[in-house]
Design a protein with these regions (language model features):
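Short phosphate-binding loop-to-helix
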Residues: 1-16, 27
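Short beta->alpha junction loops
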Residues: 1, 93-95, 153
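Short, solvent-exposed polar/charged micro-motifs at secondary-structure junctions
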Residues: 6-7, 75-77, 157-164
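A contiguous loop/helix-start segment that scaffolds small-molecule binding in enzyme catalytic cores
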Residues: 17-18, 112-208
Length: 208
């Protein structure tokens, strides 16, 4: 990733138009943050694409635009039904750049606060134990029958969708292209879908 960003910045500083392509949304567990971080470290001035930075050395100015995409949590949620209608937290289980101790703290806090929890990067060939540990942490605060949505390769031809219980999460087939949606205490499985109510039925009369 670092090599890609540095190559793109070098081309852009040479006067060329350059794009860095990420899957999903470039600002969610993707490359946009690294671009900003690299520019800050190198002291490169960043401005919006249609601005005119007067009084600045143009060789040290990059016109940068972040184009939004559809993140995996939005695509996966749409395929499952409506699991993110209420408050939620997204947590990556990859400890390559974040210490596992910090990830555990975030899992504990999100589970204790009854957020719907969206897990990115749940498992890889070299990281095969983190999802099981996350399940153990969340089970301290959630019923074992809490619905869990499993979406692999969302919106692609080979996509796969499944809904299991939190108790059986460790048996689910997941990989780095899978997003895991762990329901809150109010989330439900209805037919082949999963949803989290916003609370309308408690405040308003909805006739059966």
């Amino acid at each position: 990733e670092v090599a890609r960003v540095e190559a793109a910045i070098e081309q852009a500083r040479a006067g060329k138009s350059c794009a860095i392509v990420s899957s999903g949304d470039p600002g969610i567990y993707a490359m946009a943050g690294l671009v900003f971080e690299t520019c800050k470290i190198k002291g490169i001035v960043i401005v919006p694409p249609r601005s005119d930075p007067k009084g600045t050395d143009d060789s040290n100015v990059l016109r940068l635009e972040v184009v939004p995409g559809i993140p995996a949590l939005c695509a996966g949620a749409a395929l499952l039904g409506a699991p993110l209608t209420h408050d939620f937290a997204a947590i990556s289980l990859s400890d390559l750049l974040t210490p596992w101790e910090l990830i555990e703290q975030r899992l504990e806090a999100a589970a204790r606060s009854d957020f719907v929890i969206v897990l990115y990067n749940p498992k890889s060939k070299k990281r095969n134990w983190q999802l099981g540990k996350a399940r153990q942490i969340i089970l301290r605060h959630r019923d074992k029958n809490t619905p869990v949505g499993i979406v692999a390769r969302a919106m692609r031809e080979e996509q796969n969708i499944d809904i299991v219980t939190l108790d059986n999460l460790h048996t689910a087939e997941v990989d780095m292209q899978t997003t895991v949606f762990i329901g809150s205490s109010t989330s439900s499985k209805y037919l082949d879908f999963m949803f989290t109510p916003r609370g309308y039925a408690k405040k308003y009369e909805i006739k059966s």
